[in-house]
Amino acid sequence: MSDSIAFPNLGIYLPHVIKSFTVFGYEIAVYGITMALGILAGMYMAVYVAKKTGQDEDDYMNLNLIGIFTGLICARAYYVIFSWDYYRLHPLEILDFRGGGLALYGSVIGAVSTAVIYALVKKLKPALMLDTACTGLVLGQVIGRWGNFFNREAFGGYTDNLLAMRLPLSAVRADEVTGLMMEKAEEIGGETFIQVHPTFLYESLWNLGVLMLLLLMTKNKFKKADGEIFLWYLLLYGIGRFWIEGLRTDQLLVWGTDIAVSQLLAAVLAVGSGLLILLIRFVFTGAGRRRKS
């Protein structure tokens, strides 16, 4: 039962959820496979949207190939920087990607930076490229979050809501377990189980909704200017991440504070992008229409 995962209020019980398997003597983490699937799906989505909007698909294939490396490096760097108290004592683990430790906001920063630089070098429109690339980015997040499911990580505090997830205490890190979890813990077959918010699932479902809205905006020519779809991504993802991050028990904190860095970043990006959307909708494009009339 030590590798089981259950959603008791949904009547779902998974007796054996593996973290890794071995091929020719080499251990392969399911987390890594999940991330790879997310990357591949995101690549396809960006190329698909580029084709539908009359852009050169090759530009997005090239961008994707570069973005894989920059996204992974930035995702790892973000996690290591805000977990430095641990990694300064275990420096050899900094380059070990197999067990997790990738921060999605880091991957966003890496992917966005890569898209802007690539567009400038190729003399393309950075804002248009961000509008297209963000659809692939959010699909990658929808799938990639399931890596946390297999790793039994990135969960929230105790809950008994409909989606509550039950995990063996022995399968999670001790520093992610709260007092309330232990108060509500159950003994089943000699094993101690805790019940938590499946925040990975919340974020995956939230991002799926964001993706659907972005695709509708793209299809219906909703945007008033290049870059607006990307701003809507930052706004909607930021709102969801701010809420979900507040539930988690493994938050990366701003040094010397109790402030969750991803929650702070989500708030800043959501507010900033929301203001820019208002400016695009009611100031910049409005002024342009008045001048034409």
Segments (PLM) and residue ranges:
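A feature for loop-to-transmembrane-helix boundaries and adjacent hydrophobic helices
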Residues: 1-293
